[in-house]
């Protein structure tokens, strides 16, 4: 299985200046090439297209299109403009399903400022069969109640240790949403309540480490975010930043197998703490569902040492 194939480069719209606001100063001429490179890694969205192997996928659902975005961190006007561009790009994919996997804001102050505009931007999403969302750690640290309400008003079905049964092309598909791990709200067994052993499931879990506690429930596939792709990506090495995952750095970004199912970790749209990305552009994941070929059992990778409680970057 190859990694994500880049199919499109998208430039976000520039936000309109606020009435009476100051004009943004341009960088010195000598620094403009560096500034353009920095803006490219922060603002130019990459649409990653790939086949997503799903354990137990019915043949009739082969080719179903799903899009995922994560870690919006809408803290500035530029972040809101990037979200608007992402919505437009997702609609161009004509997806059957859209998944939002948490961390919509960084904290309560920016949430209060941008919540209405965030809700209105998401109202423009046009999935054919459903829009589903879960919360991340920053959402619980901001206001889970208010963010959940905004997501619902935008048309999203918000899953918190819950599942939904869909019938698409006359086949059943279960969407399972596990609440955030770092906020100590993840209850995988509760989320899978009512899910039958032979059901095909797409599991949404903000933190890839959730797989450590959910793998025994036999997910069909798991979609996560949280890591921002590692923020800095070095070719043939990955991220040099100290791992915030017990599951390991291999799960920082992209498609990786974990035992008998796959995890896809989206690199996210926004940034937190430091406004930086290096070789790790904002991402929209565009999936075409395929059946995971049955194979011999694979051992579950060993978890690493227990993480510190609340790191500054996530």
Regions found by a protein language model. Give the residues of each.
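Acidic, histidine-bearing metal-coordination/catalytic regions of metal-dependent phosphoesterases
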Residues: 1-66, 76, 294, 305-314
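Acidic/histidine-rich helix-loop elements
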Residues: 37-41, 69-82, 105-114, 139-143, ...
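Active-site environment of divalent metal-dependent phosphoester hydrolases
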Residues: 74-77, 106-109, 135-148, 159-168, ...
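Beta-strand-turn-beta hairpins that frame and shape the catalytic cleft
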Residues: 54-67, 156-157, 164-176, 197-198, ...
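Active-site neighborhood of phospho(di)ester-bond hydrolases with catalytic His/Asp-centered motifs
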Residues: 67-70, 97-103, 130-137, 159-162, ...
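Binuclear metal-dependent hydrolase catalytic cores centered on His/Asp/Glu-rich metal-binding motifs
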Residues: 149, 153-156, 162, 168-213, ...
């Amino acid at each position: 299985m190859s990694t994500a194939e880049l199919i499109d480069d998208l430039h976000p719209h520039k936000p309109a200046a606020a009435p009476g606001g100051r004009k943004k100063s341009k960088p010195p001429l000598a620094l403009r090439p560096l500034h353009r490179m920095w803006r490219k890694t922060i603002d130019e969205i990459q649409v990653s297209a790939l086949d997503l192997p799903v354990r137990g996928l019915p043949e009739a659902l082969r080719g179903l299109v799903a899009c995922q975005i994560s870690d919006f961190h809408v803290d500035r006007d530029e972040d809101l403009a990037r979200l608007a561009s992402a919505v437009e790009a997702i609609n161009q994919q004509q997806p059957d399903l859209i998944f939002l996997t948490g961390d919509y804001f960084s904290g309560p102050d920016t949430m209060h400022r941008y919540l209405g505009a965030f809700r209105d931007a998401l109202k423009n999403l046009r999935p054919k069969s459903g829009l589903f969302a879960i919360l991340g750690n920053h959402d619980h640290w901001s206001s889970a109640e208010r963010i959940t309400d905004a997501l619902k008003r935008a048309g999203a079905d918000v899953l918190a240790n819950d599942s939904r049964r869909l019938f698409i092309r006359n086949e059943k598909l279960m969407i399972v949403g596990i609440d955030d791990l770092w906020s100590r709200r993840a209850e995988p067994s509760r989320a899978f309540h009512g899910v039958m052993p032979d059901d095909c499931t797409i599991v949404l879990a903000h933190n890839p480490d959730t797989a450590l506690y959910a793998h025994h429930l036999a997910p069909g596939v798991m979609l996560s975010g949280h890591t921002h792709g590692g923020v800095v990506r070095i070719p043939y090495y990955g991220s040099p930043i100290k791992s915030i995952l017990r599951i390991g750095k291999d799960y920082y970004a992209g498609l990786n197998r974990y035992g008998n199912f796959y995890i896809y970790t989206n690199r996210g749209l926004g940034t937190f703490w430091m406004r930086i990305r290096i070789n790790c552009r904002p991402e929209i994941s565009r999936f075409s569902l395929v059946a995971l070929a049955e194979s011999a059992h694979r051992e579950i990778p060993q978890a690493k040492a227990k993480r510190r409680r609340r790191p500054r970057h996530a």
